[in-house]
Amino acid sequence: MKWTLKDGAWSSGVISFSEFPLIQAVEARGALLEWNIDEPERSRPRITITDEDECDWLWELIGEPAHVEFVQSAQNPNMRKAFNVAAQWNLETLLALRKLAHGQWLRDWWPTSAVDGVPKLSDEGLVREMNDVAMQVETIVDGYQFSRTEDTSVSLNRTRDNQAQSDYALVAGTVQECAITGPIFSGTSSPAWQGLPAHVVDATENPVQWHVEAAPNPVLDIQVLLADKQSNGEGLEVRVLRGPEELAHGYLDKRGFASVPLGLTVAEVWLQDWTDVVVQVGVDVKESQEVRNRIRAFAQERLRARDRLS
């Protein structure tokens, strides 16, 4: 087990991904433990020590000899920026910590989608299970309390409600009925998941439909596909952009709809080039489609998985 000093903190292990949604993490006393989302259940985490005194539980995870060796080496003023210890991993403790990280990731990033067939998870069941797991490692995550988040569309808290799979067909049918097309120009866009509250907008690609309407007053109508019929999009900000220029902005109603005045005459609307217009929903966050695709692929794997993380 190799420890490396970086930015004043000792850390071990490697994380392949830099994008936050692709990392599962749990905060322990005096340390942060992180895994790539697609690593096996008992993979070794990257451990970053944030407080050496608080991290007095480390022996429970890597064994007492390795912990003693770490403390002696880390506190040695002549020690270089890296050293190795012989860890003897406690696999049950490792699995419990990974479960906590996995559960927090599920709460924050599970890609609920009626279109893609990814159902919502039971929030109450997840909270109950994660708090039971936390009790197994209470000396490591002292004071840890896994809780469901508030169901609000104007914060970045993550929420989840239990929903039968049969409801998704109804949701998808409703969305198709209210799909919008326009006489001048129409388009679609994909919001950044990191800029949205979880489980409000359907996690399929391009859930935002928009079209330009010229009469009686020029507007841009926006319909966002919500995660299910109980989701509430009210208050989510929408911006109509052409490059850095903001053409218009507004807010969704609870159905995920907004009609945004363009401030143009009918003639000006017809003369505009709409091909480079982007409709942004939520907070402006740089995020690639590849990140979302990786999460969708991981979710499909988890739906089929039969390991101890399930």
Regions found by a protein language model. Name each.
Residues M1-E64:
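Charged, amphipathic alpha-helical stretches
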Residues T174-S310:
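C-terminal, beta-strand-rich globular interaction domains
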